[in-house]
């Protein structure tokens, strides 16, 4: 019995006792040590007896018995012979499952290069030997010789020789030198390498070389060599002499009926290798001619290549049915590979699926589960109950009872199911709310019933959706399901912290209908004592639901000690609102109910309820809201009839007026007054305006009706038209859809996004004619095609986001940093896009928040800003707050709770162990399908409007200018001479109200700090040209302006005025190439004038295309334009919107024409030009001049002699995030990405908290490039995790050494995922082969930090409830490392006790083992 316990312990050797997974190269000895014997024959099994052939690929002697505890010839059977090796057939008597783990090997007759290290770019073998891949392949595939030992000859080591050269050399030097071909040669070269010496020489070379490319190459080699030295891998192991053979049960051979076999492709590949290997051995024994042996060796190399990675080199080897065979590499990579198919996505037992239907009578925490399904899912529980209650004697009997469906079974089922939560999941599970727990209620029928309020979270509807049910089996699982996943615990959305349990559709319509008011309804003006009486009046028909009445309302308000005190008022309200008040929980104000409730208002109700009263009350309230909404929606009798779509009378006038305008434009076009493009834009403008007017007329018509009030006077009230009510309440439909039903359909788009100029003037009520129908099919199909593509793209974006962020978990409470990012309200132009309180809500303050203008601390640092504190911020009109952020968090391999702030789905500071990375990825990815795929082509109409030419303020306040340089012109107005000037309006409290960018050359009517009033124009400029502004007064002097050489004269036909146009350098004659036309300002005597305060001459160089209207010697005053540079219109560019834009931002892609930013601060000048580029020089105050070549066609925003700051725009365009990071730092790039991503989502009306985007940005910024390594373990130019550098720097700071210098690097999410520390995570994401090759050569260790790695090795994830488990393991590991050196010895008594506790059941091991053990026990 003792042995048995030991045996079982050995059998169930847990996979828990490892903390790191290391990957490396296998040495030949290691492969032999894994092996249980050599596979010598290609045979698999005997086709008659089906027994494995000896020494073949399925040999029982090597791999273990085919049947449990039975040798092949049948001499030894049963458990008592365990461990015996049969002398007849040589098979060990043991369990058959060892055939899954025992490996074999093949001794190769000639070495073979491993294809991964050869062909996976960059080729590791090539890099080590410093040879091009082509040369290595020529040696390997026997095309040329390579010199291994030159001896006393004038050959070089590693030199290639052709057949002829080799024969010549042999004649000259006989056997002085050694040259070989094939893998032996490569192996010999690798074996003879002295890595340490090689490293030294490379280091010296690195010091002495100056060329950038050489340095890069040397660094690459150096890294590889160092990783070989550190990992203990030997280079020659990249060439194999022994090939491991996979255990046979992992490449099974299955007999099909009809005498054929289904086999794994690997068997074919192995057979091919063995055949060729045996043939080669025979040829070598025979001492066959060289050419034959060589050919055989080459074929062996090819067959091993195919086994390891088929199709990597040459054509893929195909099987009998002409498809390529699946090699070992194919087994693990791709969606169908081991990682993604079996390790990350397993199928789950105890699950079922069915169609869902609506369950309007359920509570929020319940779902209806069909009896049939429940019986099947809870089977084992029922068996146990039947047996424990004595209804069945054995499991078998219980099984029979369940199959017969005896009456008692149903009672037991009800008992088992009570309070046993189940999980419901709807695919696609886009965020964590896609799986929630419910308590099952048994129902008849075959469809699962779902509570209507959770539909929004599941994104479910009842048009045939299916859902899957899973049963949490263990107590822990049930506990987690109840405490964390119950639908009642998921009221708020993790993406934005707003309620996700919001009523929609019928419920909204019912509540809206119930809370509407009506003029002169029946019973208007009644005085009622409370809600009960109001309901009575309604039920008895004394009053209508919408009548305006006075009711006594009792509200409950919390007093100082937090108890509810009743307060009663008489309130003007309606019967319906009074009835609705009956379901309001204590502590809610009546004002929230005393209004017409639309969808937004109802959402606010639930939000308020959650914030004021907590979870339980809110859940009950939400349920009541739903029941009430359904009831009154039924009573309202709203329906859609064709007469509800009222077509406005004005429609036909508006359309005919538009047609006349269009005809007029057409005439202008034909007489040549407008161009074709202008005509098109104007026509589209006209029709768009007409459509708006029709829509407006229609909505006015629909939304109001005139009724007679009690005084007999006509009064307007909101209409009770069903269609209008549905749209107005937010239940279904929108103004845009009603416009198509009762207005006009309007302009249609082609699939490429351009607009068809013939509008559809009809609406759906009138019906479309054939042409109109045809036009509209165009766009409609595009819509469907888009949706299909969008789903896939959005899913892929989510996958990349999850992958980059999966290992980000909250691992400590406070990292103690003082860093943070400064939040200000988001203002664009004159409107506040997002108020400050919305941006800082749920964040932690990084510094004390002071009352503006004083030193009084309002809120101290490290305080979580909740709703109450945000009110304080609002009241004191604070306009910028520094808050902690994930991006600036100092925690090494995770984030701290303080930097993250509030857990949006729970409303308090986030807990440790929360997987914030995955939550962020899901929150960003989940709305992805709602984003458009289109790139918008903006019509001329839109782009003309986009060109602003003035700033008109909307609020009264103080004008503030930042980054400003100006001169004052003779009218006393300011003329800007600075580039990126920003103009802000600040109110009396010092809050920013408006924010504008003002271009160079704008004329300002007010100076900095002056008061302006609302509606006033404070700045204007010409949007089509950029002026060159004179900074001094004087006389113009032309410099190098030669007519016909550098400039041409042009005369305006209409005005007759002539002007000079500067030619582009490329268009000038050769003589004019080096001339640089300029305008110089001189005084009356002709002396140079200097710009005030500098020693710079007032001389303005003119770029190509500049227009000068002044003549030589003309007088100019300060602030007047000397020349104009026409600006090309920017309106024609595509604006990438929607999903592609988000993907571009997260992938940190460079835009097509990036903005050019100043790399350093200094004075701009231009150097010698080349053919297509000009040379920009920036000279700083001290230090060396920076120069950059810029293409001629780029428009520059700077003039010669201008002072720029680092990071200023030199040429317009889209900014590259990499530039922003390099020149303006981490904060700027975070701001940029967050705002740009939010811009896309805001357009679609999707709310996502900034935090989530910051989390992704943190992951994109987790690598750094070492710029100065000193004597640390890093190399210069190496890419390292920032956390690693920080750890090293802390250590160096303690030792008093200089800190390693580094630059943060921004990686796109795909790159960042592949560059993660964990090779398991990277390999399961993309490019599996490359990742594993790199990891193996470097001998990487995977610390199993992230979630993905732990899922793959089959452990609890280090997040959520698994977080504590992992922390304990770490503690125990530290303690255990000291103590656990001696082995624990049990006393005999303990052994006995343990043994007596063992009774074997089918779960312990495989069923047959249990039976056998019990039999063996009986026998003893």
From Swiss-Prot:
Organism superkingdom: Bacteria
GO cellular-component term (any): DNA-directed RNA polymerase complex
Residue numbers binding Zn(2+) 2: 815, 889, 896, 899
Keyword Nucleotidyltransferase in annotation: yes
Cofactor: Mg(2+); Zn(2+)
EC assignment: 2.7.7.6
Binding site for Zn(2+) 1: 71, 73, 86, 89
Catalytic reactions of this protein: RNA(n) + a ribonucleoside 5'-triphosphate = RNA(n+1) + diphosphate
Keywords from the named record: DNA-directed RNA polymerase, Magnesium, Metal-binding, Nucleotidyltransferase, Transcription, Transferase, Zinc
Binding site for Mg(2+): 461, 463, 465
Matching SMART domains: RPOLA_N
HAMAP family membership: RNApol_bact_RpoC
UniProt family annotation: Belongs to the RNA polymerase beta' chain family.
Record text on subunit structure and interactions: The RNAP catalytic core consists of 2 alpha, 1 beta, 1 beta' and 1 omega subunit. When a sigma factor is associated with the core the holoenzyme is formed, which can initiate transcription.
Main function: DNA-dependent RNA polymerase catalyzes the transcription of DNA into RNA using the four ribonucleoside triphosphates as substrates.
Name the record gives this protein: DNA-directed RNA polymerase subunit beta'
Source organism of the structure: Histophilus somni (strain 2336) (Haemophilus somnus)
Gene label: rpoC
């Amino acid at each position: 019995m003792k042995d048995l316990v030991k045996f079982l312990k050995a059998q169930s050797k847990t996979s828990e006792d490892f903390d790191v997974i290391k990957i490396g190269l296998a040495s030949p000895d290691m492969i032999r040590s894994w092996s249980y014997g050599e596979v010598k024959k290609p045979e698999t099994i005997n086709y008659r007896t089906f027994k494995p052939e000896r020494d073949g690929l399925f040999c029982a002697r090597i791999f273990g018995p085919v049947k449990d505890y039975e040798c092949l010839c049948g001499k030894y059977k049963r458990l008592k012979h365990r461990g015996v090796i049969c002398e007849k057939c040589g098979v060990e008597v043991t369990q058959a499952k060892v055939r899954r783990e025992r490996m074999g090997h093949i001794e190769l007759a000639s070495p073979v290069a491993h294809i991964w290290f050869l062909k996976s770019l960059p080729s590791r073998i090539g890099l080590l030997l410093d040879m091009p891949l082509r040369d290595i392949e020529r040696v390997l595939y026997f095309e040329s010789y390579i010199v291994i030992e030159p001896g006393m000859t004038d050959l070089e080591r590693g030199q290639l020789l052709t057949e002829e050269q080799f024969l010549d050399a042999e004649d000259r030097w006989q056997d002085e030198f050694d040259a070989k071909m094939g893998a032996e040669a490569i192996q010999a070269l690798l074996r003879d390498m002295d890595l340490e010496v090689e490293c030294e020489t490379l280091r010296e070379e690195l010091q002495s070389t100056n060329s950038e490319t050489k340095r890069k190459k040397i660094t690459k080699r150096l890294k590889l060599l160092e990783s070989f030295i550190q990992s203990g891998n030997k280079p020659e192991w990249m060439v194999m002499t022994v090939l491991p053979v996979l255990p046979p049960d992992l490449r099974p051979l299955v007999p099909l009926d009809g005498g054929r076999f289904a086999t794994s492709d690997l068997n074919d590949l192995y057979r091919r290798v063995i055949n060729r290997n045996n043939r080669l051995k025979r040829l070598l024994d025979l001492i066959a001619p060289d050419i034959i042996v060589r050919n055989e060796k080459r074929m062996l190399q090819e067959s091993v290549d195919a086994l390891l990675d088929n199709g990597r080199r040459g054509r893929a080897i195909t099987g009998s049915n002409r498809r390529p065979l699946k090699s070992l590499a194919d087994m693990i990579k791709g969606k169908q590979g081991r990682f993604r198919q079996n390790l990350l996505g397993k199928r789950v037992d105890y699950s079922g699926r069915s169609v869902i239907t609506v369950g309007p009578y359920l509570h929020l925490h319940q779902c209806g589960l069909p009896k049939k399904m429940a019986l099947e899912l809870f089977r084992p529980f029922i068996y146990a109950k039947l047996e424990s209650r004595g209804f069945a004697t054995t499991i078998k009997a219980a099984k029979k009872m369940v199959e017969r469906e005896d009456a008692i079974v149903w009672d037991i089922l009800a008992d088992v199911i009570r309070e046993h939560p189940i999980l419901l999941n709807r695919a696609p599970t886009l965020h964590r709310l896609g799986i929630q727990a419910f308590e099952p209620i048994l129902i008849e029928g075959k469809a699962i019933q779902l509570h209507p309020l959770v539909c929004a979270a599941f994104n479910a509807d009842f048009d045939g959706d299916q859902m899957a049910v899973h049963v949490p089996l263990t107590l822990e699982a049930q506990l987690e399901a109840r405490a964390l996943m119950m639908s009642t615990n998921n009221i708020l959305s993790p993406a934005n912290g707003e309620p996700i349990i919001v009523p929609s559709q019928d419920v909204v319509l019912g509540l809206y209908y119930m809370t509407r008011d009506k003029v002169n309804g029946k019973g208007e003006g009644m005085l009622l004592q409370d809600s009960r009486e109001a309901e009575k009046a309604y039920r008895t028909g004394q009053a209508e639901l919408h009548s305006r009445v006075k009711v006594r309302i009792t509200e409950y308000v919390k007093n100082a000690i937090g108890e509810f005190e009743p307060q009663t008022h008489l309130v003007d309200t309606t019967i319906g609102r009074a009835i609705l008040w009956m379901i309001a929980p204590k502590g809610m104000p009546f004002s929230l109910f005393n209004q017409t409730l639309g969808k937004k208002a109802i959402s606010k109700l639930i939000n308020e309820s959650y914030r004021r009263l907590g979870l339980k009350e809110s859940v009950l309230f939400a349920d009541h809201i739903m029941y009430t909404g359904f009831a009154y929606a039924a009573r309202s009798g709203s329906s859609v009839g064709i007469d509800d779509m009222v077509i406005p009378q004005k429609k036909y006038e508006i359309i005919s007026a538009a047609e006349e305008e269009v005809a007029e434009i057409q005439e202008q076009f034909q007489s040549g007054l407008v161009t074709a493009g202008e005509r098109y834009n104007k026509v589209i403008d006209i029709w768009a305006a007409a459509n708006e007017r029709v829509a407006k007329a229609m909505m006015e018509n629909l939304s109001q009706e005139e009724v007679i009030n009690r005084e007999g006077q006509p009064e307007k009230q909101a209409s009770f038209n069903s269609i209008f009510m549905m749209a107005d309440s937010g239940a279904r439909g929108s103004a845009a859809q009603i416009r198509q039903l009762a207005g006009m359909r309007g302009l249609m788009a082609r699939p490429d996004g351009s607009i068809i100029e013939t509008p559809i003037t009809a609406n759906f009520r009138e019906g479309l004619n054939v042409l109109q129908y045809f036009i509209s099919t165009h766009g409609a199909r595009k819509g469907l095609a888009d949706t299909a593509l969008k789903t896939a793209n959005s899913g892929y974006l989510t996958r990349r986001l999850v992958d980059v962020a999966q290992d980000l978990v909250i691992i400590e409470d406070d990292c103690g940093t003082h860093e943070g990012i400064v939040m200000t309200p988001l203002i664009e132009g004159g409107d506040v896009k997002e108020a400050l309180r919305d941006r800082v809500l749920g964040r932690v303050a990084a510094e004390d928040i002071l009352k503006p203008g004083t030193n009084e601390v309002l809120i101290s640092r490290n305080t979580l800003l909740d709703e109450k504190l945000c009110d304080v911020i609002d009241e004191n009109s604070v306009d910028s707050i520094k808050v902690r952020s994930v991006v600036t968090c100092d925690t090494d391999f995770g984030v701290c709770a303080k930097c993250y702030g509030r857990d949006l789905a729970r409303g308090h500071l986030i807990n440790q162990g929360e997987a914030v990375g995955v939550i962020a990825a899901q929150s960003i990815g989940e709305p992805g399908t709602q984003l458009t795929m289109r790139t918008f082509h903006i019509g001329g109409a839109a782009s003309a409007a986009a060109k602003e030419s003035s700033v008109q303020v909307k609020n009264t306040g103080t004008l503030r200018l930042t980054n400003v340089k100006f001169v004052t012109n003779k009218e006393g107005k300011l003329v800007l001479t600075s580039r990126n000037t920003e103009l802000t309006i600040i109110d009396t409290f010092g809050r920013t109200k408006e924010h504008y960018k003002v271009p160079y050359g704008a004329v300002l009517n007010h100076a900095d700090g002056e008061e302006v009033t609302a509606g006033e124009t404070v700045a204007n400029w010409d949007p089509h040209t950029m002026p060159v502004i004179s900074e001094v007064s004087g006389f113009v002097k032309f410099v190098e302006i030669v007519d016909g050489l550098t400039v041409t004269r042009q005369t305006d036909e209409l005005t007759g005025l002539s002007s000079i146009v500067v030619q582009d350098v490329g268009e000038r004659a050769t003589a004019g190439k080096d001339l640089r036309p300029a305008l110089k300002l001189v005084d009356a005597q002709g002396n140079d004038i200097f710009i005030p305060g500098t020693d710079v001459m007032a001389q303005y160089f003119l770029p190509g295309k500049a227009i000068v209207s002044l003549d030589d010697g003309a007088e100019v005053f300060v602030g007047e334009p000397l020349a104009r540079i026409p600006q090309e219109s920017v309106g024609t560019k595509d604006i990438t919107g929607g999903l592609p834009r988000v993907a571009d931002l997260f992938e940190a892609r460079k835009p097509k024409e990036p903005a050019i930013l100043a790399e350093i601060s200094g004075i701009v000048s231009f150097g010698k030009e080349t053919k297509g580029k000009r040379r920009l020089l920036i000279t700083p105050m001290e230090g060396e001049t920076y120069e950059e070549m810029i293409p001629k066609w780029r428009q520059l925003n700077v003039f010669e002699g201008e002072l720029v700051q680092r990071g200023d725009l030199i040429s317009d365009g889209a900014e590259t995030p990499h530039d922003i990071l390099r020149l303006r730092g981490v904060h700027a790039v975070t701001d940029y990405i967050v705002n740009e991503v939010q811009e896309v989502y805001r357009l679609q009306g999707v709310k996502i908290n900034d935090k989530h985007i910051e989390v992704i940005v943190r992951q994109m910024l987790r690598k750094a490039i070492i710029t100065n390594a000193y004597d640390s373990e890093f190399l210069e130019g190496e890419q390292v995790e920032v956390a690693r550098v920080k750890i090293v720097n802390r250590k160096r700071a303690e030792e008093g050494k200089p800190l390693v210098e580094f630059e943060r690097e921004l990686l796109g999410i795909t790159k960042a995922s592949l560059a993660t520390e964990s090779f398991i995570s990277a390999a399961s994401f993309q490019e599996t082969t490359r990742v594993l090759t790199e990891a193996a050569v470097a001998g990487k260790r995977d610390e199993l930090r992230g979630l993905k790695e732990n899922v793959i090795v089959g452990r609890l994830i280090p997040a959520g409830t698994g977080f504590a488990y992992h922390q304990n393991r770490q503690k125990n590991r530290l303690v255990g490392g000291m103590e656990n050196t001696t082995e624990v010895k049990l006393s005999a008594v303990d052994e006995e006790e343990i043994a007596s506790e063992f009774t074997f059941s089918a779960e312990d091991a495989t069923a047959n083992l249990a039976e056998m053990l019990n039999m063996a026990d009986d026998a003893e």
